[in-house]
From Swiss-Prot:
Name the record gives this protein: CATR tumorigenic conversion 1 protein
Domain of life from the UniProt record: Eukaryota
Gene: CATR1
Record lineage: Eukaryota, Metazoa, Chordata, Craniata, Vertebrata
Length: 79
């Protein structure tokens, strides 16, 4: 799994331009369009990710280590 430190800083901003705390960062594969990624993943965040209970479950969602999108993690801190 890619470490938070490897994510470009500009991807660690919320919609209010607040820096997301590292323990609230979820790593996801990005698609070609950043905005499309945000839109497509927002619904997934509130549905699938709420079901995840352990950090190791997130590894199955990471299909590539070349480009990643950081979004807010709405679950509990698993660190």
């Amino acid at each position: 799994m890619v470490l938070n430190e490897e994510i470009p800083r500009h991807l660690l901003l919320t919609q209010n331009n607040d820096i997301i705390p590292k323990h609230h960062i979820l790593i996801l594969p990005a698609v070609d369009s950043y905005q499309k990624s945000v839109n497509d993943l927002r619904a997934l965040t509130f549905s699938k990710f709420q079901e995840l209970k352990h950090a190791h479950e997130l590894r199955n969602l990471c299909v590539s280590q070349s480009r990643f999108l950081a979004i807010m993690w709405f679950g509990t801190n698993t660190n």
